[in-house]
C-alpha cells in the first residue's frame, strides 16, 4: 500500500507531498542502523560468547536448567550463542517487528527454532505464567541494551522491570557489571563546541569584538550527550586535569533502580588549569570475577592500545561542565556524576557532596536558545576565528560605504561583520522565532539593536516594505541552514537568491559568488564496516541480516550519499580530488538540469570503499571556503577534513571484499545530475573494470 507523506525539501525550501511505501520508515531505520557494525565488532561478540558460556556453566553446575532471557535480541545472535553453550531454552525479546521477523528466520536457518522463542514485544510487556509469553522466570539474563552513554537506550528501566517480573532473584547476568569512567580535562577545542567565544573583527577603525550575551555565557548548554570517536581528538587538543576516575558501577545480576542518583569521586588535580570538559566511557564485565571485560576506553586509557577494537555503535562521551572552573594542582575537588533513567551529566564540587545541598541538581537544559539553534559543530564553526577572518577578507573586497546588505543564513553573524566593516544598512532574514530571538539578544549585547534590521519571515516572502524601499546591493550568506543534512542542501541559498531577484539593485553582488561540488575516492580505515556484509558471525549464519540491510538500502538509499563527519573516520584518498559541478549564484537557478559524467583514475593502491563529496563556496574569485578537504592529501593519501561539517559518503555497491587483493578496479565512473525543479542531486558512482 502507498501512503502520502509531507516533506520539507531542504534545498528548495518547499514542502512536498511524496508517495511512499507504507513500510518506508522501517526501511530507513534498518538502512541507517548499526546492526552491521555490531556484527563486525569481534571483541564484543567474543566477550559475550565467553560470558554466556561461563554463565550457562555456572547454572548447570548447580544442577539447574539454563533458561535464558535475551532482551533486545536483534539478529538472535546472543540467544544462539546461549543454546550452543548448552542453554535449555531461550526467550529472545525484540520490539522492532522487521528485526524480530529476521531473527525468527536466522534462528530457523541455524537450526535453533526448537530452543529459541522470538517474542515481538517490548520487554516490559512480556508476561510470565501458564498463559504468558514465558511459562516461568529465566535464571540467566542476557542483554545488549547499551548505547555510548550506557543508559541512553533505556537499559535501567528495562533491567528494573526484568528483575521484578521476568528473572529469578540473584540470576546470572551477561554482562554482569558495567562501570562508568570519567576524566576531567581542559580543552579549548571541545569547549568551543558548547560556548560562544568573543569574535574579533579587524576593521579600518581598529579591532571590534562581538561578545556573547550574558545568558548565553551562563547557559549550561544542550542536555544531550556529545558522542564522538574520541581517539581522533589529538592529545594536543586537551590537557588532562585528573586521573581516570571510576564514577559508578551497576550490578546487572541484582535488582537495578532507574531512579535518579549521583555518585562522587574525590580527586586531586594533576595540574592547574580550567576545568571545562569531562571525557567519559564505560566497560562491561561479562563474569562476576571481572576476567572477561569489554572496554570503550580511548587509546591513552586502554590496556592494549595496539589491539583496540574499532566500533561506531559504542563510542566515547564528551560532557561539558555548566561553567569552566579554575582548579589548582593538588587541591582536592569532587567530580560528581548525576544520572536519571536515561541521561548522565557531571558537575564539579569544592566540598564533599554530603555537605553540599546543590549536588542533587536537575539535568542541565538550554535556556538561552543558542544551543537549540546551533549544534556542537556549528558552535565550533562560529568560534573558528580563521574562518571569520576569511569572511572579513572577502567582505572588504565587495563592500562599499553605501552598500545595502541582505544576509540570508540561519543564526549567522555575517550581518554583524558587515556592519563593523562600515556598511550603510544591513538587513538579516531569520525565518524561525528561535534564531530571531537569539540574534536580537546578540545585537543588544553588542549595542547593535538599532543598527541591524531583523526580518522574521521566510526570505521568499520578502516585500519592498521589509527592506524599507531600498534595493539590495549585496546579498550575503555563509551559506548555512539548520535543515541541511547533506552538503548540497545549503544550495537553498541559490533558491533564495532567485526568489529575491526583484529586490536586487543594478550590479548587485552575491557572496558567495558561486559554489562547486567536489569528490574524491577513498579507502576508509574502518568506516567501511558499517556497510559491509558480515555473512558469518562467530560461527552463525547471518546472511539473512545482510540481505535485509541490502534490501533496505536498495529501497531508498543505495543511490544516495549519507552524511558523516570524516574528521572522526580516517581514510586515504585513492584518487585526486575533482570538481563535478559548479553553481553560479550571480545568476538565478537555471531551468535545465546540470549534468556531469566521466571516469576518474585511482592513483594509489587500496580498497576503494566510497566516493566522498563536499561543497566549496567561492566567496570571491580569490577566496574559497571548503566544507570538505582543507589541504592536499599527504604522500600516503591521508586526508584533512573540515571538522565543522559533515561530508557526503557514497559507498560503492557491492562493498569491496576486505580479504581481496589490492589489485582491484583502477578507475571509477560517475554520473551526477542536479535537478533544479526538485533541488535533488542524483548520483551514481561505480567501479569500472578497466584493465591496467
From Swiss-Prot:
CC terms in the record's Gene Ontology section: cytosol; fibrillar center; nucleoplasm; nucleus
Alphabetically ordered keywords of this record: Chromatin regulator, Cytoplasm, Differentiation, Disease variant, Dwarfism, Intellectual disability, Methylation, Methyltransferase, Nucleus, Repeat, S-adenosyl-L-methionine, Transcription, Transcription regulation, Transferase
Enzymatic reactions: L-arginyl-[protein] + S-adenosyl-L-methionine = N(omega)-methyl-L-arginyl-[protein] + S-adenosyl-L-homocysteine + H(+)
Entry's EC annotation: 2.1.1.321
SAM-dependent MTase PRMT-type domain boundaries: 14-345, 358-684
Gene Ontology terms: biological process: chromatin remodeling; genomic imprinting; peptidyl-arginine methylation; regulation of DNA-templated transcription; spliceosomal snRNP assembly
UniProt subcellular location: Cytoplasm, Cytosol; Nucleus
InterPro entries in UniProt: Arg_MeTrfase (IPR025799), MeTrfase_PRMT7 (IPR014644), PRMT_dom (IPR055135), SAM-dependent_MTases_sf (IPR029063)
Major location (coarse): cytoplasm
CDD domains per the UniProt record, alphabetical: AdoMet_MTases (cd02440)
Entry's family note: Belongs to the class I-like SAM-binding methyltransferase superfamily. Protein arginine N-methyltransferase family. PRMT7 subfamily.
Related illness: Short stature, brachydactyly, impaired intellectual developmental, and seizures: An autosomal recessive disease characterized by developmental delay, learning disabilities, mild intellectual disability, delayed speech, and skeletal abnormalities. Skeletal features include short stature, brachydactyly, and short metacarpals and metatarsals.
Protein name: Protein arginine N-methyltransferase 7
Organism of provenance: Homo sapiens
Gene this protein is translated from: PRMT7
